[in-house]
Amino acid sequence: MDSPSAGYTFEYLIETLNGSSQKKFFNVPKLGGTKYDILPYSIRVLLEAAVRNCDGFLMKKEDVINILDWKTKQSNVEVPFFPARVVLQDFTGIPAMVDFAAMREAVKTLGGDPKKVHPACPTDLTVDHSLQIDFSKCAIQNAPNPGGGDLQKAGKLSPLKVQPKKLPCRGQTTCRGSCDSGELSRNSGTFSSQIENTPVLCPFHLQPVPEPETVLKNQEVEFGRNRERLQFFKWSSGAFKNVAVIPPGTGMAHQVNLEHLSRVVFEEADLLFPDSVIGTDSHITMVNGLGILGWGVGGIETEAVMLGLPVTLTLPEVVGCELTGSSNAFVTSIDIVLGITKHLRQVGVAGKFVEFFGSGVSQLSIVDRTTIANMCPEYGAILSFFPVDNVTLRHLEHTGFDKTKLESMEEYLKAVKLFRNDENSSEPEYSQVIQINLNSIVASVSGPKRPQDRVAVTDMKSDFQACLNEKVGFKGFQVAAEKQSDTVSVRYDGSEYKLSHGSVVIAAVISCTNNCNPSVMLAAGLLAKKAVETGLRVKPYIRTSLSPGSGMVTHYLSSSGVLPYLSKLGFEIVGYGCSTCVGNTAPLSEAILNAVKQGDLVTCGVLSGNKNFEGRLCDCVRANYLASPPLVVAYAIAGTVNIDFQTEPLGTDSTGKNIYLHDIWPSREEVHQIEEEHVILSMFKALKEKVEMGNKRWNSLDAPDSVLFPWDVKSTYIRCPSFFDKLTKEPAASQPIENAHVLLYLGDSVTTDHISPAGSIARSSAAAKYLTNRGLTPREFNSYGARRGNDAVMTRGTFANIKLFNKFIGKPAPKTIHFPSGQTLDVFEAAELYQKEGIPLIILAGKKYGSGNSRDWAAKGPYLLGVKAVLAESYEKIHKDHLIGIGIAPLEFLPGENADSLGLSGREVFSLSFPEELFPGITLNIKTSTGKEFSVIAAFENDVEITLYKHGGLLNFVARKFL
C-alpha cells in the first residue's frame, strides 16, 4: 500500500540543514514565496506533508497546489493528508485490531497473502480505558472475581512469552530522566508531616508513594478482568509490524501521546519533517498545544491510515483566535478553557481549524495550551493549533528533551517558517479573526447537563435554583416550588445527615482535561491542605475520587506534599485511566440511593472532566457540573452546589469562625512556586523508562504466536466479526433501499453514548442476557467498552442507553416498536425480528446526530442491526464518516426541513434508490407508503467517500486492495 515514489514530484526542494551535513528537509517556503508567508501555520504543516508525499497517485500535484492556494480554495476542495503516526486507545483500538485480524482471515479465504495485512503507519496503542473503580475509600467492596469474564479457557491460545517491544525514541537520544530512590515518598519540608500514609508502589514509577491500597487492588482486578483482551493486544504487537502497545497503568492515550509519544519534529532516514498524528480518541487534539498537528477521526479511517492510505478532509477554514490581556488571579486554566469554549461555540467554528495568536498566547504555559486544545471537540472545531514558539522550546528543555535534537528542531522549524515569534511584525491571514480578552474571563462551571452551558461561580446558586423551576430540558428539572426545600434524613456510617436538592454525592478529580495541568491540580492540593489545616472536612457519604491521567500527577502531588491532604478529604487515587469519566464509577451506597429516590432529589456530581451528559456518572445523579479541580474540592467540602461562595461559608474552624472559600483559595504565586519546584524539572523524568519497561503483570502475560489469530468460539471478549462475511473480489452495484421501516425516531443531540454506551452493562439488557446465557454472572459482565472486540455484545448494546429518548416510546428507554407486530421490544430484539423478516431499517433523527466521543461501534452496531441509512438534520462529522466507513448512507433533510415539518410520523415505509453516478451533495428522492415524496441530500463530501460507500465501507475497500 505504500506510495511508489513519495516525494519524487518535489524532490528539487530537498535541502540540507545548515547545522548538519546529514539532516535533510523539504524547503517548502521556496515553493510558495509570498503565498506561503500568508498561510496559517497549521496549513503550512498540511502543505509540507503533501509535498513530501506527492507521488501523483494518492497525493497529486493538484492537491499540493490547492493547499498552497488555501486562501481561495478553503472549504471548496478535498485534500488528502498523511499523518506521521497513529495513536489508539483500547476501547477503539481493540475493534481496530480485531478488524485487522479478521481482514487477514478474509484475505486468505479469497486467495490473498494474510502476511501483507499490517499497519504501514507507526501505531501506538495505549491501554487506558479498561480501568473500573471497584475499590475506593468510601466503600472497599468485595473484589470481583479476578478472573471475571474469563471463565472460558482460551484453549486455542498457544502460550508464548512475548518480550515487550522497545518503543521508538520520541525526540531524544536518552530518556527524560529517572526517579531517584525514594523520590516519590519524600514530602516537602515546608508541609506538616502529621498525616501518616501507607506507602505502596506507584505503577508508574515502581517507587513507594503515600497513597491507599486501592490503586494496586484496582489494577489487580483490571488485569484479571481483562486478561483475554490484554493477551490479544500482546498478540497484535507481535503479529503486526509497526504496532507498539503501551500497557495498563501508564496513563490515558491523549496524555501519554503528549508526554511520551510526541516528537514535535520527526526524523526518518535523516529526513526532518513536522510531527503529526491522528487517533481514535477525539481528545488527541491535546497535542496541538505543543505545536503538533493532530485530530481525532473514526476508528475505520484510522485503520485506513494504518494501511498507508491518507485521511481526507475538506481544506478547512482557519479561524484566527487572538488572545489579548491577562487572566486575573482567581481564574484557572479550566476557566479559560470554558470561556474560550463558550465564545467559539457562539461564533461557530464547527468543521474548522482554530489557530491562536496574539500577545496573550505567550502568557499561557504548554499545559494551559494543551488543556485548551484538548477541549476543541467540545466547541466543534477539528483542532485548535498553537504554533511552536519559545514557550514550547522552554517546556521541552525543562522536560529533558535532548539538547542536540532541540537545536536541530529549532533550526528546522525556523527554516520552514513553522516557528512563531512575538517579534514578527506580521501574522498569517485567516478566514476570520476573533478576539478574546483574557481579562473578561471569570471563574465558572458548566452544567447541569451539557459542557457548553457555562455558569459563573458567582451565579451558581441562583442558576441552580432557576434549573429547579424550569421545565425538563438541558437547563431544567421542573421541581414543584413547594418541594424545592425538601430534605431527606439519612443515616450513614453511624451519623445523621440531610440531603436536599443540590446535595453533592459524587466529587471526582478525574482523567482527561485537567490532570495534565499541574497548576490546577496543585491548586486543588493546596486548597485541600488549607482546608484540612482549618478543620474543614468532606461528608463521608460523598463518593470522592482522584483518577490521574498518568503517574506524573502522583509524582508531583506527592513530591509537593499535598497528596496527603487530598487523601484526608477523601480524594484518594483510585487508579490510572478513564474511570468516572466514562461511567465506570463505584456505586453510591444503598442508604444514599434510597434517600435520593425517597425525596426525588436532584443531587449533583461535580467533576473535573469535559463531559457531563445526563446519566453519564450515575442514573440517580441528575445534575452534573464540570469544574476546575480546586472547585471540585470546594464543592465537596460545601456538600452542595446550592451555595454562594462570596457570602456563605464552607464551614467553621475549631473556634466556630466561619471559613469562606477566599480564606483557603491558593494564590497564583503559591501555585507557580510549587509548580516550578516540584513539577517542571522532574515530572517527565521516568515516563519513557516506565513505558519501555512495561509492568510486571503485562510482561508475564502469555500470547499466541501465529499469523492468523486463533479465535476461541467460547470467548465473550474476542470474536471474529461478520463484516467480511459477504466480501467478494469486486464490489456489487449500489442496491436500492426498498420498503424500509424506521427502527428509531430520535430528536436532537443524540450522542454516541446514546447509540453505543461505554459504561456498565445493565442486568436487564440484551447484552446481559447474552452473557448470562454463556455462564457469566453480573459481576463478570465488565463494560461495553471492554467488550468492543465482541460483535455479539456490541450489537446487543447498540441503543441500549437508558437515557435514549425514542419518540415512538415517549419516554427515556432503550425500547422501540416493531411495527409489523405492534410489539414494544428492546431495540436489539426488534431489529432481530426485522432482519428475520428481510426488512431493511432506517433511523430518523434531528440535529447533531452522533455528537460526543468518537466511537466506531456507534456506526458498526446499527449496521449489524440492519440499518441501511440515517436521515437527520445534521451530523457530527466524525460519526458521519463512521457511517460511510461501514456502509450506511448518511442522508440529510433539505435546509429548513425535518421530520416534523414534512409531517412524518416514522410509521411510514420508506423507499429510495441510488443512481449509478453519485456525486457529493447529490439530491435523492424518498417515497413513502402514504404516497408522500420528499427530497434529501446524500451527505457525501468527496469522491473518496462515495467510492467507500459503493464498496460497502472502508473495510471492504481496503481488504480488496490486498487481493
Swiss-Prot record:
Origin, by domain of life?
Eukaryota
Q: Tell me one Pfam family matched here.
A: Aconitase
Q: Which residues bind [4Fe-4S] cluster?
A: C512, C578, C581
How and how many cofactors are bound, per the record note? Binds 1 [4Fe-4S] cluster per subunit. [4Fe-4S]-binding affects RNA-binding activity, thereby inhibiting activity of the protein.
**CDD domains the record matches:** AcnA_IRP, AcnA_IRP_Swivel
Needed cofactors:
[4Fe-4S] cluster
- GO MF annotation list: 4 iron, 4 sulfur cluster binding; aconitate hydratase activity; iron-responsive element binding; metal ion binding; mRNA regulatory element binding translation repressor activity; regulatory region RNA binding; RNA binding
Q: What is its subcellular localisation? A: Cytoplasm
Instruction: Write out the PTM section of this UniProt entry.
Output: Ubiquitinated and degraded by the proteasome in presence of high level of iron and oxygen. Ubiquitinated by a SCF complex containing FBXL5. Upon iron and oxygen depletion FBXL5 is degraded, preventing ubiquitination and allowing its RNA-binding activity.
Main localization of the protein?
A: cytoplasm
Q: Sorted alphabetically, which keywords does the UniProt record give?
A: 4Fe-4S, Cytoplasm, Iron, Iron-sulfur, Metal-binding, RNA-binding, Ubl conjugation
**Any single GO BP term:** cellular response to mercaptoethanol
Expression tissues: Ubiquitously expressed in rat tissues, the highest amounts present in skeletal muscle and heart.
GO CC terms on record? axon; cytoplasm; cytosol; neuronal cell body
Q: Name the family the entry cites.
A: Belongs to the aconitase/IPM isomerase family.
What does the function comment of this entry state? RNA-binding protein that binds to iron-responsive elements (IRES), which are stem-loop structures found in the 5'-UTR of ferritin, and delta aminolevulinic acid synthase mRNAs, and in the 3'-UTR of transferrin receptor mRNA. Binding to the IRE element in ferritin results in the repression of its mRNA translation. Binding of the protein to the transferrin receptor mRNA inhibits the degradation of this otherwise rapidly degraded mRNA.
Complex and partners: Interacts with RBCK1 only in iron-rich conditions. Interacts (when associated with the 4Fe-4S) with FBXL5. Interacts with CIAO1 and CIAO2A.
In Swiss-Prot or TrEMBL terms, this protein is called Iron-responsive element-binding protein 2
Task: State the species of origin.
Answer: Rattus norvegicus
